[in-house]
């Protein structure tokens, strides 16, 4: 399943998001959600043990001036990659 997070983590039920993550899922951070990808962010730390891949939309990272602060554990993607993720994951959950 592809989970998309367009909001800062404190604006959503993040514990519920963590509970619903399954092995092989992906989490795409976009819009204000890219703040989760900042190195040392407590929400990112809680994702480290999850059996998922965390992606962040590069355009949203750049728009917020966060390029140098993003954790190396987060995969940066562009809009083309975003489309590929939506094709790869038939099921999606928007938070």
Swiss-Prot record:
Keyword Cytoplasm: yes
Subcellular location: Cytoplasm
Pfam families for the chain: DsrH (PF04077)
GO CC terms: sulfurtransferase complex
Main location: cytoplasm
Family according to the record: Belongs to the DsrH/TusB family.
UniProt protein name: Protein TusB
Taxonomic lineage from the root: Bacteria, Pseudomonadati, Pseudomonadota, Gammaproteobacteria, Enterobacterales
Primary gene name: tusB
């Amino acid at each position: 399943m592809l989970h998309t997070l367009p909001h800062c983590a404190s604006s959503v039920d993040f514990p519920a998001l963590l509970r619903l993550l399954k092995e092989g899922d992906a989490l795409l951070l976009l819009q204000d959600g890219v703040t989760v990808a900042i190195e040392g962010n407590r929400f990112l730390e809680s994702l480290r043990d999850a059996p998922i891949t965390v992606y962040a939309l590069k355009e949203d990272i750049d728009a917020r001036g966060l390029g140098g602060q993003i954790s190396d554990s987060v995969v940066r993607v562009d809009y083309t990659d975003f489309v590929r993720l939506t094709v790869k994951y038939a099921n999606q959950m928007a938070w």
